[in-house]
């Protein structure tokens, strides 16, 4: 162990070199801080073992020498540019780990208590994989001790012996590759997506810085080895994994374009699976991280510590897939920027991952009540300003006297507020009843029931107010109201409460003046007073119900029905008398008329030009035919002579009638003549009626 310290120096010297490297490169310190989250999640036992392995095992650069010279001497890949990129990638990773070791040393004392529990689990995990690594580790330690000496001595001059040593080391690594792969598949590979992305980003940033100092490169390689050893797994697994990655990088340099495409496809599928896994793990991150969250300073550390709590199977599967993805990214020349861009597009920035859980899902602070709008109830509510309007109101002082009484006037008393004027005075009102201001029915009495006042002049000519009412207070304390000739008893009673006030009206407002404490009531003094009598009469009239339906006795027949019958008989008698008078008048007029005229016999053929004796009347023919038939019917009767005489008389009357009608037609004109002809035909059809009328007339004349 003394030889190892002489070769590599003590831990204090390594820490001093780390500080110098930190001050030398400021840009590398930022990614180093990001990667320190996973180092803090490791256990103290791992750190102890890492210190031992760091003292025993050499760094990658000491084993293999400079990558650029290795590529030139070995002729495995045949391309100098690819080896230079792999060298730059490893150099960048080493520079990143330099800062991580410093942060781990600072936080080592604070995280010892938290890593004790994880130490037991890591020891159990390392025990499962110790057997397959024992042989490889033994051979590696023996070979590495010699190689480190050669690497330290030949680093300054870059001699050919270093290339030969590198070739021998490569052969040893090829022999141990199968064993390392088997141990890697059985063990756990706790690598996080954030570290891989940081490694890819650091590769781009450090491509221009590949000519840094050899001393810093060796220190960076040691820090890189410690970075992988600080993870919550065994040191042998991480060292073997590092060596296997270097060997695979050399093999991938010689692969063709088809191999690079296949590795890119596998990397894309692995990234998709990891993305789904990270989305499912975001929900349980707060519960699983627990104590680790308190030691992290930013959101990226939270995501890395959350990855350390995953199950063993998921971590192992992710480590194998990410190893392939990282190898393909380091080997590819043109596809490396595109792969980094795809990874950043898939996973995003670490700040974006934790921003949603920190800000959006943060519960409200207890003890602060919130209202429906999300505002604190403790905040004072804004009160609306009061609107004040200054108004000047004159103060009214009234002389209310010594005593103030509240009076509710009964219905038999009333007060006239206006002064009495004989010119407009009305003794009695037309309406017997009226409604007061309160809607009660009030009796309209005469002067003795209305309190009035007036203004008159005294002997000196001064105005004096008189009233027809006064209150008299007797020696026993009782009072009475004298209103004209009527006397009313006055009763005093106290008022309960301050609910009755005296106000003075001013425009639309009221101004209070006093508070009533006593009330007065009035009653008639005796039942003999006029007020009492009139009041009782009004009550009697109000109580007596008027009978709206009258019942009359039915003696004999209904006089209305008899009256209607008598009116009908009287009308019939008048019509009969009028008819007789008209018939008698006609008979008298016909006696003075002449014989028949041809003008009226033919009303249908009447024409002024065709007037003459040659025209024949149809009515005359009909009468002639009827007369002959009646004569034949009377042959067998015993009264044939009498009938013949009657027929002669009728024919004469008819002829006279026709003559009179004809003369009237000449006077009235053509239109009136046609109307009369129609009336004559109607009369001819009513011949028996004419006979009856004529018989009656003859009987009356005989009488």
Swiss-Prot record:
Residues 74-92 have a biased composition (Polar residues). InterPro entries: Leo1. GO terms for molecular function: RNA polymerase II C-terminal domain phosphoserine binding. Residues 1-391, 553-572, 578-613, 627-703 are annotated as: Disordered. Residues 1-15, 370-384, 661-670, 694-703 have a biased composition (Acidic residues). Residues 242-279 form a coiled coil. It is found in: Nucleus. Residues 23-42 have a biased composition (Low complexity). GO terms for biological process: positive regulation of transcription elongation by RNA polymerase II; transcription elongation by RNA polymerase II. It holds the Pfam family Leo1. It comes from the Eukaryota. Residues 53-64, 105-116, 123-188, 197-317, 557-572, 578-592 have a biased composition (Basic and acidic residues). Its main location: nucleus. Keywords: Activator, Coiled coil, Nucleus, Transcription, Transcription regulation. One of its GO terms (cellular component) is Cdc73/Paf1 complex. Component of the PAF1 complex, which at least consists of cdc73, paf1, leo1, ctr9 and rtf1. The PAF1 complex interacts with PHF5A. Belongs to the LEO1 family. PANTHER family: LEO1 PROTEIN, RNA POLYMERASE-ASSOCIATED PROTEIN LEO1. Component of the PAF1 complex (PAF1C) which has multiple functions during transcription by RNA polymerase II. PAF1C associates with RNA polymerase II, is involved in transcriptional elongation and in histone modifications including methylation on histone H3 'Lys-4' (H3K4me3). This is RNA polymerase-associated protein LEO1. It comes from Xenopus laevis. The lineage of its organism: Eukaryota, Metazoa, Chordata, Craniata, Vertebrata.
């Amino acid at each position: 162990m003394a030889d190892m310290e002489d070769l590599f120096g003590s831990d204090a010297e390594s820490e001093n070199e780390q500080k110098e490297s930190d001050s030398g490169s400021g840009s590398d310190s930022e990614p180093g801080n990001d990667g320190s989250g996973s180092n803090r999640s490791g256990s103290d036992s791992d750190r102890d073992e890492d210190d031992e392995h760091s003292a025993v095992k050499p760094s990658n650069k000491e084993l293999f020498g400079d990558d650029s010279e290795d590529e030139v001497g070995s002729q495995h890949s045949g391309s100098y540019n690819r080896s230079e990129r792999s060298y730059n990638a490893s150099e960048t990773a080493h520079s990143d780990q330099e800062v991580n070791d410093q942060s781990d040393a600072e936080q080592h004392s604070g995280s010892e208590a938290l890593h004790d529990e994880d130490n037991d689990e890591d020891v159990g995990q390392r025990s499962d994989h110790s057997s397959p690594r024992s042989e490889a580790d033994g051979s590696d330690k023996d070979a590495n001790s010699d190689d480190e000496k050669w690497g330290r001595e030949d680093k300054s001059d870059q001699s050919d012996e270093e290339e030969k040593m590198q070739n021998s080391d490569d052969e040893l690594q090829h022999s141990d590759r199968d064993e390392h792969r088997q141990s890697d598949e059985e063990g756990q590979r706790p690598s996080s997506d954030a570290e891989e992305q940081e490694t890819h980003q650091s590769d781009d940033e450090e491509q221009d810085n590949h000519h840094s100092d050899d001393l810093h490169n060796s220190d960076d390689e040691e820090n890189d080895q410690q970075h992988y050893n600080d993870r919550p797994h065994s040191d042998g697994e991480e060292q073997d994994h590092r060596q296997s990655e270097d060997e695979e990088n050399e093999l991938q340099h010689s692969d063709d374009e088809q191999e690079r495409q296949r590795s890119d496809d596998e990397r894309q599928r692995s990234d998709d699976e990891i993305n789904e896994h990270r989305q499912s793990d975001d929900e349980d991150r707060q519960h699983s991280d627990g104590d680790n969250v308190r030691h992290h300073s930013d959101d990226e550390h939270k995501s890395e510590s959350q990855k350390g709590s995953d199950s063993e199977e998921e971590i192992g599967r992710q480590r194998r897939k990410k190893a392939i993805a990282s190898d393909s990214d380091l080997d590819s020349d043109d596809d490396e920027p595109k792969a980094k861009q795809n990874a950043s597009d898939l996973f995003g920035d670490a700040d974006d991952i934790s921003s949603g859980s920190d800000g959006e899902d943060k519960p409200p602070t207890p003890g602060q009540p919130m209202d429906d709008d999300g505002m604190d109830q403790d905040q004072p509510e804004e009160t609306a300003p009061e609107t004040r309007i200054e108004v000047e109101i004159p103060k009214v002082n009234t002389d209310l006297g010594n005593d103030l009484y509240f009076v509710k006037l009964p219905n038999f008393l009333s007060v006239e507020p206006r002064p009495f004027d004989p010119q407009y005075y009305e003794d009695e009102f037309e309406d017997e009843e009226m409604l007061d201001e309160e809607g009660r029915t009030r009796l309209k009495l005469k002067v003795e029931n209305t309190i009035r006042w007036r203004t008159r002049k005294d002997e000196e000519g001064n105005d004096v107010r008189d009233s027809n009412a006064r209150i008299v207070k007797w020696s026993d304390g009782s009072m009475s109201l004298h209103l004209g000739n009527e006397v009313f008893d006055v009763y005093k009673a106290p008022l309960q409460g301050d609910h009755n006030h005296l106000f003075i009206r001013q425009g639309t407002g009221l101004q209070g003046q006093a508070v009533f404490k006593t009330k007065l009531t009035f009653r008639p003094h005796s039942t003999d007073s006029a007020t009492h009598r009139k009041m009782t009469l009004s009550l009697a009239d109000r109580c007596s119900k008027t009978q709206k339906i009258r019942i009359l006795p039915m003696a004999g027949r209904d006089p209305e029905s008899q009256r209607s019958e008598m009116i009908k008989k009287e009308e019939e008698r008048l019509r009969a008398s009028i008819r007789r008078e008209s018939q008698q008048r006609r008979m008298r007029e016909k006696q003075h008329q002449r014989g028949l005229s041809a003008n009226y016999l033919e009303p249908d053929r009447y024409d002024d030009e065709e007037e003459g004796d040659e025209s024949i009347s149809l009515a005359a023919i009909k009468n002639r035919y009827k007369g002959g038939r009646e004569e034949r019917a009377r042959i067998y009767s015993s009264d044939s002579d009498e009938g013949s005489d009657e027929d002669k008389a009728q024919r004469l009357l008819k002829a006279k009638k026709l003559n009179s009608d004809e003369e009237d037609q000449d006077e009235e004109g053509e239109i009136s003549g046609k109307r009369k002809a129609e009336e004559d035909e109607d009369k001819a059809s009513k011949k028996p009626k004419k006979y009856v009328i004529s018989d009656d007339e003859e009987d009356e004349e005989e009488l």
